[in-house]
Design a protein with these regions (language model features):
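Conserved phosphate/metal-binding and DNA-contacting active-site motifs used
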Residues: 1-147
Length: 147
């Protein structure tokens, strides 16, 4: 893996239950099915690639106070995506609980990660919500990876 040590330093304190896929230029372009055989951080860093993605839903789990959770993400993409979120969900995303957030550095783009209680993982559906063309947000849970 290119930049293996830099990636490890950035992710070494992530929860034990997170699972990863290898990527090339922000795409999972490899023959293995990362959803059937997800990798630990250590495993994925030994492979070819130039980045890693974290798998969502039941692929990346943790237990908090005896309760099991899977990882979910809300992806905000484009100017006014916060208004699109508010239109479809019913409240301003600024009211969301503070959480780990990542960005590519591009204006108005970010992903916010949340632990979803196990009983809701099958109830919540992946969805993409667009409003007036470009501004959208996406709820990512099941067979999906995030960069």
């Amino acid at each position: 893996m290119r930049a293996r040590h830099k990636i490890f330093e950035a992710l070494k304190n992530t929860p034990e239950g997170l699972r990863f896929c290898r990527t090339w230029d922000k795409r999972a372009k490899y023959p293995e099915n990362q959803y059937q055989n997800p990798f630990t951080l250590e495993e994925v860093l030994e492979m070819e690639g130039n980045g890693v993605g974290v798998l969502l839903g039941r692929h990346s789990t943790t237990t908090i106070n005896g309760k099991k959770y899977g990882l979910g993400a809300i992806d905000f993409d484009g100017t006014d995506s916060d208004l699109t979120f508010e239109h479809h969900v019913g409240f301003d995303p600024a009211a969301l609980t503070k959480t780990v957030t990542v960005t590519s550095g591009k204006k108005d783009r970010k992903q916010m990660f949340y632990w979803i209680p196990e009983e809701y993982l099958d109830v919540l559906k992946k969805g993409e919500y667009k409003h007036e063309g470009w501004a959208n947000f996406e709820l990512r849970i099941g067979d999906h990876y995030s960069m």
